[in-house]
Regions:
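Extracytoplasmic soluble-region selector
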Residues: 1-12, 16, 20-37, 41-81, ...
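Solvent-exposed loop/turn segments flanking beta-strands in beta-repeat/beta-sandwich domains
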Residues: 54-59, 217-237
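Gram-positive cell-envelope targeting signals
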Residues: 215, 226-228, 252, 265-267, ...
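Beta-strand-rich modules
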Residues: 252-273
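Recognizes extended acidic, P/S/T-rich segments that occur
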Residues: 225-256
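Predominantly extracellular/luminal cell-surface or secreted proteins
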Residues: 61-63, 150-152, 227-231, 264-268
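Ser/Thr- and Asn-enriched, surface-exposed coil loops between beta-strands
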Residues: 37-41, 131-133, 205-212, 244-249
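Pro/Thr/Ser/Gly-rich low-complexity, intrinsically disordered linker/stalk tracts
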Residues: 196-220, 274-289
Length: 289
């Protein structure tokens, strides 16, 4: 409707000002829109105008994100759907709807972060050994997310910015892979790297009813396991544990004279309650005197 204001003052001229005053909507006559999730291909916001008068014919006057007014080519409003193009990011947007007959209505729309994805070619647990070649975790994330890496124990394994893991010492390290981005929820994946001692080598000297077995001293190990048997497949072998890496010799007595024995050795590393075993040496045979 229109309001006319008239002013008269003494000998001054009469001034009339006519202005259109848009009525307010009733309290229950509102425009609403639900929050949405970010989509790199574009975002659709469904606007509910069912409670406003049919003759309101609301259109979008402007969209603001904080103090920034979005350019008109970054969105389109048609048939109750407000479509943002792919350049619109996560954030809170205030949409101003205008009508020729009613006062403007402001509606807040929140664009929430989307669920990102993160995959790796590497399994959740990787078993390797000292001397092994570096390998890549093969991580891939949703486009628009940045992948970063961190090692819990750089004395065991390091990881480069492109996800290449290098073995440094025996033990256990956890590689945390993180994918993050301004439009996505952060995703993390943990990969456990278990590094065992390297493969052992073994030699032995025979004597009267005994064998003196020697192997390579391994400072990356906690200790060693020595196996001896009368069968080549080591079925029924007796196992001896040497608990110090500094000891690299074991004499086994009370063996049968003129009997052939098969021996092999491996190193192990103790981490908490876990033992990491290196590969056994090649099986060697010796005939006791």
């Amino acid at each position: 409707y229109y309001v006319t204001l008239e002013s008269k003052s003494g000998s001054y001229a009469t001034v009339k000002v006519t202005a259109m005053v848009k009525p307010l909507l009733a309290d229950d006559a509102t425009i609403t829109a639900k929050d949405v999730t970010y989509n790199p291909k574009g975002i659709k916001v469904f606007v509910d105008t069912s409670k406003v008068p049919e003759d309101a014919a609301y259109t979008v006057a402007k969209v603001k994100n904080g103090s920034k007014v979005l350019s008109e080519d970054s969105y389109e409003y048609k048939d109750g759907v407000l479509t943002f193009n792919k350049n619109v990011a996560v954030g809170t947007y205030v949409v101003t709807f205008e009508s020729a007959k009613y006062q403007d209505v402001k509606v807040s729309v929140k664009v929430n972060k989307a669920k990102g994805t993160l995959t790796t070619k590497a399994k959740t647990t990787v078993n390797t050994a000292i001397g092994s070649k570096s390998f890549n975790l093969g991580a891939k994330a949703t486009t628009g997310m940045k992948v970063s890496y961190a090692s819990s124990n750089k004395k065991v394994a390091t990881v480069s910015s492109n996800g290449t893991v290098s073995v440094k010492g025996t033990g256990i390290a956890t590689i945390t892979v993180t994918a993050s981005g301004s439009n996505y929820n952060t995703v993390t994946k943990k990969i456990t790297i278990k590094v065992a001692p390297k493969k052992q080598s073994v030699k032995a000297k025979t004597a009267k009813k005994k064998l003196t077995i020697t192997w390579t001293k391994d400072s990356n190990a906690t200790g060693y396991q020595v196996q001896i048997a009368t069968k080549k497949n080591l079925k029924g072998a007796k196992t001896y544990t040497v608990k110090s890496y500094k000891t690299y010799k074991k004499t086994i007595s009370k063996l049968k004279s003129k009997k052939k024995y098969y021996v092999r050795v491996r190193s192990y590393k103790t981490v908490g309650k876990t033992k990491l075993y290196g590969a056994y040496s090649t099986v060697k045979s010796y005939k006791v005197k």
